[in-house]
Amino acid sequence: MENQPKLNSSKEVIAFLAERFPHCFSAEGEARPLKIGIFQDLVDRVAGEMNLSKTQLRSALRLYTSSWRYLYGVKPGATRVDLDGNPCGELDEQHVEHARKQLEEAKARVQAQRAEQQAKKRERKPRPTTPRRKEGAERKPRAQKPVEKAPKTVKAPREEQHTPVSDISALTVGQALKVKAGQNAMDATVLEITKDGVRVQLNSGMSLIVRAEHLVF
């Protein structure tokens, strides 16, 4: 019997589950809420496949259910599904609220990391300190400073102008625009127009809902 290939990361396990159970897991886009107790169902269904262990399955499930796209799918009225995509009851309010808090905390962490990175870039490098002259050492005569020429003025680069998005209803799925993050604007693509704003996908692959005031062309 030939040895089966081994999946080395949780992302590879998720990709395998999305292919093995396409009506339950998804590799991209909004994810559907999973049935409570689906871990045991997975153990029973994929035991021995791809040399998967329970630890790998548990880690992959934890990564999948903590992703932004999964938390976006945990909303009022959504239905949990089993491995075959069969409905397993609606989400209760407690789980919806828990997912909302997780999503807010994740967004706050990302914003804090970006702010910290921008602050580090703005920090000036400390000036090197000159060693103090030893007592009794002769002072060297100061050299006359050469006449300094007036520095040439360098024109500051023109800031890129952006047009704010005034009406999100005029946007279309697949349209390219930018998301303002502090002083920067990141390229993004429209995925969906929702009542809370616009769901976009950044070039990094991350998808999030953004209000109109943070969108520009």
UniProtKB/Swiss-Prot annotation:
Q: Where is this region: Disordered?
A: 105-166
* InterPro entries to which the protein is assigned, alphabetical: ProQ, ProQ/FinO, ProQ/FinO_sf, ProQ_C
Question: Pfam families, per this entry?
Answer: ProQ, ProQ_C
Query: What are the protein's GO molecular function terms?
Result: RNA strand annealing activity; RNA strand-exchange activity
Q: Where is the composition biased (Basic and acidic residues)?
A: 132-162
* Predominant cellular place of this UniProt entry's protein: cytoplasm
Compositional bias segments (type: Basic residues): 121-131
**PANTHER family of this UniProt entry?**
RNA CHAPERONE PROQ
Role according to the record? RNA chaperone with significant RNA binding, RNA strand exchange and RNA duplexing activities. May regulate ProP activity through an RNA-based, post-transcriptional mechanism.
Q: Which family does it belong to?
A: Belongs to the ProQ family.
Q: What is this protein called?
A: RNA chaperone ProQ
The organism named in the record is Escherichia coli O8 (strain IAI1)
Specify the taxonomic lineage. Answer: Bacteria, Pseudomonadati, Pseudomonadota, Gammaproteobacteria, Enterobacterales
